[in-house]
Amino acid sequence: MKFTAIVGTTSPKSYNRTLLQFMQAHFKDKADIELLEIDQVPMFNQDQPSTNPQLLEINQKIIASDGVIIATPEYNHSIPSSLKSVLEWLSYELHPLDGKPVMILGASIDAQGSSRAQLHLRQILDAPGVNANVMPGYEFLLGNAHQAFDDKGQLNNEATIDFLEICFFRFMRFAKISNQLNVEEDFSFAPGTYEVHALGHGGALPMQVSFSEKKIESIHIDTAGETEGLADVVFVRIPDKIIEGQTLNVDALSGASETSHAVIDGVAKAVKLAGVNPDILKKRPKPASSLNRDDEEYSCDVVVIGGGGAGLSAAATVLQAGKNAIVLEKFPAVGGNTIRTGGPINAADPEWQRTFDENPGERHTIEALLSTDESEIHPEYLADFRALKEEFAAYQQQFGDQKGYLFDSPLLHRMQTYFGGKRTDLEGNSIYGQYDLVKILTDHALESVQWLEEIGVEYDKEVVFAPVGALWRRGHKPVKRYGTAFILALSRYIESMSGTILTDSPAKEFLIEDGEIKGVIATGVNGQKITIHAKAVVLASGGFGANTKMLQQYNTYWSHIADDIKTTNSYAMTGDGIVLGQSVGAGLIGMGFTQMMPVADPNTGELFSGLQVPPENFVIVNQQGKRFVNEFAGRDVLTKAALAEGGLFYLIADDEIKKTAANTSQEKIDRQVEAGTLFRADTLEELAVQVGMEPDVLVETINKYNRYVEAGHDPEFHKDTFSLKVEKAPFYATPRQPAVHHTMGGLKIDTATRVLNENNRPIKHLYAAGEVAGGIHAGNRLGGNALADIFTFGRIAGKTAMSEMD
């Protein structure tokens, strides 16, 4: 028989290891016992994938064995945290112990010989998700372990050896009988096609699962109501894995575990309808493709770490120039945070914007900006400030008191980016955007919009948008919703140009040769080593908005960041690219500043629920039904105001404002109303009752707001940009609460995106673009500027990387 024996401690000197080594030699004629160490398995973190190489090896060894022996010491009356962590890993996405025969033993210098630890271990192994088959009784407790072995590691007491033999031989019989019970029972499906439902983000997903007598033949999922992106990969890969292995023992996809399990559960329902116990298929081995762990090696001109907008832009630029590129993406699908955006990309385009009328109050917004005392403006921005004054004076002279077109220019974009980013933290440290970087952003944003159009992005040119906190209507919004338009166009272009995208492949370290960066070492989906030799590396891995501990570590702007704070970010945004940069001496800038998105879903942190309308149509009220802030203000201003009101607030809309929401459909609205996550009523009074407000208060607030819209001026909170009144039923209330949205700081870069070290000198062959880099947005980012940033500096990174290849 073949057994695996887990050394239940990371201690380099352990009597439990010595005990297992004794058993390995003593019983070699009876069984093959292989010792497994756990010293390289990280502490359990459900937000990280189960891809640690040592963990995967333990998993496969357990699956292939006839039984498992676990030797545990006793720490503070329980098992070591390292062993507990390994068992958590082995009961989360991996389940090799399910039904597996297990023998427990332990050695301790205490006379009781780990008895309390063994009791706890039995309870853990019996828990749902672990479900091991632990041999009852016959506990082997080796007390006074420091006296139990001779200098050759042999047990020195014959009675102890005799009892160990009794326990082990009983375990051999127990394992044989237990494994006979685990032999899969014969079954037959009732052939046919069965309709079930899986729960996706967009609601219930109809599924059709077809069976022959012995096989799952096909799985079809109707994804019409889902947003394109990571979910697409789930709906293809999970069914493919199930059919390949004829098993429900399929790993969930990182970043989409909820949707993955929904698909698996949906197929399990169909299996049951077809007359078979789904537990049989859950105990089957994983598909063969999930077991491939062969190391891989590649060579290219440029390797890009991160498959969001910045990374894909860099790769596409390299491919356009006839060079080759590889993109490494840690998640199962490309997209990063870009695919989760609202869609509009900021770029001053005066010729296009002149086709739109100015809105009430917009001219006043510019006048207020230009009234800033020059003593408050940093010297490098003064010339642009004065030039903007001249531009706007000419506009004023042209129209006077008459209604004009929507004014804009790269200078206005630049000054709004500058003023929008000027902030002072809790320690009195001030920050503002580096002029040379901001100038590149605002001068070249329109080129990025046009380049994306050439790549295949189609824009809705009938409307100009202002995202939340944008301060101005200059957003170019794609026809396709959210950030999907950018990611689909770029990934298809890269594929058409024979570029390579490796998903499920987090970068772990740089490949260093003769003191220079020569590529990247990554880990594949099954834990295999991926080595990429490259002439240049572009870091485009995003920020750290999904890493609460890192946010708390660097925070100097917010008085408190709670452990349970939500985020709008992809769960891939954990700051690993920043840490990777630091490993070669990269300098950091602006790390203490984090932007919150004020209008996030209070339960999930997402942006795509409720009615997400342009800020000129925002009507924000607190839980009492009163306005409390200028709805057109910057994101951190809105967030601070919301937090002062308790965090939770509501966006009020009517039927006309609803039509300006870019994130939804009537079907989705109806589902959310039914689920109680969006409120709808025929009168404002009824709406107030639904959300727990005094009807008279909400009605008075809305009446007052409507008067401000008519006048084009808000004397209460000085909102000066309006569009629609709230007057046509039905009326809506969308619950909102701030969530982490954008980490302002990151790696230091120059205008060519070279990563700078702590002495502001370039690190050879290393470039960075997107949220992983800092210095552009300073303390607060304008809505719509992130997309302008990633596509502008992503392209620059690709160009610079090519131009500086050896």
From Swiss-Prot:
Cofactor binding summary note: Binds 1 FAD per subunit. Binds 2 FMN per subunit, one is bound covalently and the other non-covalently.
Processing after translation: Is flavinylated on Ser-257 by ApbE, encoded in a neighboring gene. Covalent attachment of FMN is essential for catalytic activity.
InterPro entries: FAD-dep_OxRdtase_2_FAD-bd (IPR003953), FAD-oxidoreductase_2 (IPR050315), FAD/NAD-bd_sf (IPR036188), Flavocytochrome_c (IPR010960), Flavoprotein-like_sf (IPR029039), FMN-bd (IPR007329), FMN_Rdtase-like_dom (IPR005025), Succ_DH/fumarate_Rdtase_cat_sf (IPR027477)
Residue numbers bearing the FMN phosphoryl serine modification: 257
GO CC term, one of those recorded: membrane
First-level EC class: oxidoreductase
Biological function: Component of the NADH:(hydroxy)cinnamate reductase Crd that catalyzes the reduction of the double bond in cinnamate, p-coumarate, caffeate, and ferulate under anaerobic conditions with NADH or methyl viologen as the electron donor. Is moderately active against acrylate and practically inactive against urocanate, fumarate, methacrylate and crotonate. CrdB is the catalytic subunit that binds substrates. Is likely involved in protecting V.ruber from (hydroxy)cinnamate poisoning.
Subunit structure as annotated in this protein's UniProt entry: NADH:(hydroxy)cinnamate reductase Crd is a heterodimer composed of CrdA and CrdB subunits, encoded by adjacent genes.
Domain remark text: Consists of three domains. The first domain (NADH:flavin or FMN_red, PF03358) carries a non-covalently bound FMN and is used for NADH oxidation. The second, FMN_bind domain (PF04205) contains a covalently bound FMN, that acts as an electron carrier between the two other domains. The C-terminal FAD_binding_2 domain (PF00890) contains a non-covalently bound FAD and forms a site for substrate reduction.
Protein name, UniProt field: NADH:(hydroxy)cinnamate reductase subunit CrdB
Organism taxonomic ancestry: Bacteria, Pseudomonadati, Pseudomonadota, Gammaproteobacteria, Vibrionales
